[in-house]
Amino acid sequence: MSKTQRTELSKQQEKFFKVLRSEDGQLPPGIRNLGIKPHLWLKEVSYGRVIYEWPNDGSRDIEDERVFGGWIAALADHIVSMTMASALEDGEWLTTTELTTRMFRPMQGGIIRIEGRLVNRGRTTGFVEADFFQKNGKLAARASAAKAIRMRSDFS
């Protein structure tokens, strides 16, 4: 008997994303200290998919119109993690086991649209990607990540 593929957020994840999107939500120190603002940037979330809009104001540039690659990788890890989180069952959580970020062109200023998608979800692993699009619609970067999926209690 095959298991039906779920297409909605689990109850746990509905609650998680509600807190994440609230202005007074308690963000983990790593996210807060990096200046990632999901309450402002997360525009859409559904099973296996997130859309972020990051207002690139130049504050993370190493040169004019060149964002520091480490910042892109950190933001990418957050976004692919949120993409994977959207596909978790109640009681599950995740950790990154591999992250690859490729920059195709310098990241311009303005709104950067980032689309995260679930590529594959197994019982204990998942694979996710995120594409960074510049305001002109050109693909500027792509991140891909493998995620270990465990019961949340295993992380305690």
Enumerate the language-model features and the residues they cover:
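Terminal targeting signals and extreme-terminal segments of soluble enzymes
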Residues: 1-156
